[in-house]
Amino acid sequence: MTTTLLDGGEGHRYEEHAGDWGGLPPGASLREIADVVVDPHGRVHVLTRGEHGILVFEQDGEFLYAWGEGIFQRPHGATLGGDGTLWCVDDDGHGIYQCSLDGKVLRTIGTPGQAAAAMSGKPFNKPTKLAVHPDTGDLFITDGYGNA
């Protein structure tokens, strides 16, 4: 395995790992990755469009666990909330999910599987991403494909 370290300045480091990073459970792959989030414990949560919606790794690539089977139709974005929960956006499923880091769905926003009329401005028609305000916890959701 070859590792290339790039110095991005101002204390930012970028490492490129060539080779086999992360052993995977049966049926999982690192293709069609929609987003990636690092939690406060340094674990890497990879949002995929495969059988397992979320693959969780240690920073060194050691596979820990997977979750999300049957939740998402087509995951599109993930955001770590200030409370340590993971927000997942499902564009084809037209829903937003707030989840614990071990995969329990805590809250759903929108009606999964039901799209608002295109260009109606009503939520949701293929949402794409979510941001959480660090001070207030307010959610900002882009409804980017069917309501853009």
Please report, for each region that a protein language model flagged, where it lies by residue.
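Eukaryotic scaffold repeat domains enriched in small/polar residues
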Residues: M1-A148
